[in-house]
Each structure stands twice: as structure tokens, then as C-alpha cells.
Amino acid sequence: MVEQDPYEIVIKQLERAAQYMEISEEALEFLKRPQRIVEVTIPVEMDDGSVKVFTGFRVQHNWARGPTKGGIRWHPEETLSTVKALAAWMTWKTAVMDLPYGGGKGGIIVDPKKLSDREKERLARGYIRAIYDVISPYEDIPAPDVYTNPQIMAWMMDEYETISRRKTPAFGIITGKPLSIGGSLGRIEATARGASYTIREAAKVLGWDTLKGKTIAIQGYGNAGYYLAKIMSEDFGMKVVAVSDSKGGIYNPDGLNADEVLKWKNEHGSVKDFPGATNITNEELLELEVDVLAPAAIEEVITKKNADNIKAKIVAEVANGPVTPEADEILFEKGILQIPDFLCNAGGVTVSYFEWVQNITGYYWTIEEVRERLDKKMTKAFYDVYNIAKEKNIHMRDAAYVVAVQRVYQAMLDRGWVKH
């Protein structure tokens, strides 16, 4: 597990970015603090008639650029510090993508595996009743995150509508909803689809003519890992030579079929022992001789211990925080092009934004329109960051922070919240 306090990391990253730009002390001080922190108590009647009391949070880090946006996590070890850190990262993620949002995040300390569906519904509705006064389609828009899903979003939206006595625009109160009640096409593949566009552009700046025949290894075979394997092989002609999950990985130099591997994983509980492939460890996967490496599982997998052994030319951070700051330096020295997490995996929040736009306007797009608009957004964001990195000769992560912080700072200046 992560040993550093998550919010301390946020402050360090912000201070580091400030070295590469002109920003006033007072603005920096402002950005180090969330604008609103809400802690709520949620009593829930359990199926056996007893009442359990849960603690929930909603953090709105900064709303200079628009309503705050961010997921709701249900986790037994949820902490306020983690929620604060993730809310700040949403501020940077929405800013780097140039979405008209600020950053928010929510969480409930709960082990959802111990709840029945009816108990989950009561908890979801209770949470919305508790935070009702600080959310709205124009103030703070939640979404699914760890251990929450479209069904939970549907209950939450329904509760919000019941209290507010409003219909259609209330669809926009929450994103990541089922398609039947205002969800967007393309949302389920959005994180991987967005990452694929950044990998395509990274290959161009490295002078590759095509991705066809190039190799990729993907750590993690959840939603993002599976869709990335499918998209990179089927749409870009790449060879997916290795994938893994928490139990281990598989390698086949001739390439793996994404759908067949998923079927195997669903039937056997892991990708391991997939026919025609060699079993490898997660550690071995990271050090394979491949063109692109995509960590799409957990944080801090590339560290100062193994960074020197990374052989990929592009590291696409589909997971949050998969590379430690020390490892960043080593990869940069090695000339590896890193696509930082809050750029690489921003396809999810971007399609959430598209969902909100469709809800507010009442006009829904085809899957082709969603993908085309996502492509434009991801491509522009990639070059916004890459050009700063080149111009200042700094790491892509530092450049992404500079782009994001500069945009938030400008909004704060224009509002008169801070001075130059």
C-alpha cells in the first residue's frame, strides 16, 4: 500500500509545478486547500432490522473553472486525505482536458461486499440525502468510482429527482448512468479509448509511421485493461504480447486475442494458464522488451527499484499513479516518453462531460460522434502538454501540471479571487 499521505503528495506536486511557471504565493496557498469539505453521517437500516451508521465525504477542491466533478468511492479503508487528494487530481485532470469543470470526489467508509443489494440502495439514497445541499447539475456532479457502478448512480439520481421534484435536467446531476436513463454511448470504453488516442500521438512524435505490428504489454485486465487490449489490437493493429491481473500474467510473442483472454479470465478467475501463452509475473511483464507499456492496474508499480529495467519506449499511465516520482526521473533520463496518468486516463471524465452535455441539451449522440469528439479532445490535450514539455525540456508530468495549474490560476485571477 501507499505509505505517503496522499494529500502531502498533492502539495509536493503542486509546489514542483510552480517552479516552472509564474504564480503568486497566495494563489499557491489557495490551491493547496480544498474549497469545501463535507463529512456526513448516514444511518442505514440493514436487512435484519438493525441500523448501521456510515461515514461519508464529499470534497470540492476548486470550482474556479466550473462545477466540480468526480467519482464516489465505496471502500472499507476510505480516508478523508485520499478523497481530498483525488478531488485535487480531478481539478488538474479536468483542466488539462480543458473541460468547464473543477475537481471533486466523494467517498463512504464501507465494505460493499458485505452489503446486500437492498442495503446498497439504502446507503446510496442516504448519501444523496446527506449531501443534497452541495450537489446539483450546475454545482457538483458525481460519477462512479471504486466499487460503485451505473446501478448505484441510477439510485442516486432517482433520489435526487425525488427530493428536487425535477426531471430531465436532473439527469445531469450524475454521470456514468445506465443508457436507459441518460447514460452516454461509449462511456464503458472511454478510459481505454482516450488512452489509445494518446498512445497514437506519442508514437507520431517519436517518428513511428504506424502502430501496426508494434508490441504492447498491459498490466491489469479490468475494464480499462481489456478495452485497451481490444482497441490497440483491433483498431490500431498492435500486437498485445502480454497482459496480467492481480494473480499473475501471460506472455505470447505472437499476440493475444483480447476477447478470448477475457472469456478465460471470467471462467477461471485469472488470465493465468491461458492456452498457448507462457505464465509470467506482474514484475516480469513490466520489464518486457515491448514498444509500449501500459500499467492499467494499481499505483506505484514502477519504482526506483525497477525503472532502470523498463525497455518500452512509451509508458502509458492508464492507472492512477503507477510510477513513483523517483522512477519518473529515471525514465526521463532514459528518454522514455511517459504519458502521465491524468492526461492518459482522462477519457473517462471527458465522456462523463459529454454525458452531462447530452443530458443538459436533451440531444443524444451516436457512438461515432462520441469517439470523434473524444479523439479531438485527447489529441489537443496531448499536444498542449507535449509542447510545454519540449519547450521547457521538462518531464511530461510536470508539463501536464503546468498546463492544468496555469488554467485554474487564470480563472482565479479573472474572478478576482487572487492577485498576480
Swiss-Prot record:
Gene3D superfamilies from the UniProt entry: Leucine Dehydrogenase, chain A, domain 1, NAD(P)-binding Rossmann-like Domain
Catalytic reaction list: L-glutamate + NAD(+) + H2O = 2-oxoglutarate + NH4(+) + NADH + H(+); L-glutamate + NADP(+) + H2O = 2-oxoglutarate + NH4(+) + NADPH + H(+)
Active site, per annotation: 105
Localisation: Cytoplasm
Residues that bind NAD(+): 220-226
Listed InterPro entries: Aminoacid_DH-like_N_sf, GLPV_dehydrogenases, Glu/Leu/Phe/Val/Trp_DH, Glu/Leu/Phe/Val/Trp_DH_C, Glu/Leu/Phe/Val/Trp_DH_dimer, Glu/Leu/Phe/Val_DH_AS, Glu_DH, NAD(P)-bd_dom_sf
Top EC category: oxidoreductase
Keywords: Cytoplasm, NAD, NADP, Oxidoreductase
An individual GO BP term: glutamate catabolic process
Gene Ontology molecular function, alphabetical: glutamate dehydrogenase (NAD+) activity; glutamate dehydrogenase (NADP+) activity
EC identifiers of the protein: 1.4.1.3
GO CC annotations on file: cytoplasm
Quaternary structure, from the entry: Homohexamer.
NCBIfam families noted in UniProt: GdhA_Arch (NF040817)
Assigned protein family: Belongs to the Glu/Leu/Phe/Val dehydrogenases family.
UniProt-recorded name of the protein: Glutamate dehydrogenase
Organism expressing this protein natively: Pyrococcus furiosus (strain ATCC 43587 / DSM 3638 / JCM 8422 / Vc1)
Lineage per the UniProt record: Archaea, Methanobacteriati, Methanobacteriota, Thermococci, Thermococcales
